Amino acid sequence: MSTAVTPILLFTNWPFYVDKRLFAYLYRIKTDPKYPIVDLEYIKNKANELASENDQFQAYLREMDSNQLDKLVYSLSEDISPKISCTSCGNCCKSLMVNIDEDEANRLSEHLGKTRADFDDAYISKGESGRMVINSIPCHFLVENSCSVYEYRFAGCREFPAFHVPDFNKRLFTTYMHYDRCPIIFNVIETLKEELGFEKSK
């Protein structure tokens, strides 16, 4: 007894449409390090490679509706940030100039068992306007890539990279200052390009 076999057509002449973003995503998984990307050397090199593309992307983002962009960036950040360990990276602590207010200085000086005067002498620079910043880059409190005063870290450190703050497209310059050194920023920006279907013009 013979059994009829129905052939399966793998290719047809019918028109079909493919979302190019899917292929971009699959290509990224195949060629890039494990996603999300946390290899700092790779990120630095890739940032140099994508410099021209990122100039165009910034111009593209400035034309977007600010509220819609904020929602998308926040959503991507909420997905990506938990997958990247800031406490095992510490790269931002090697490059950020951190502002400090009086309450933060008082709290940390007390934690360290120092008078405010001694704390200020050791760790703070003050401008003519009274603005206070940490006087060392890398930060004094970075020890083996981890913050030694993590529970007492400053607001600027807690909020970085500030994807939850409104008006993202007005902070592109400062965001891109750290694109080549912060895995969260790098991954959010690159995923944002895919979500928006952005392609560099030639």
Predicted regions mapped to residue ranges:
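Short loop/turn segments that flank or connect secondary-structure elements
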Residues: 19-202
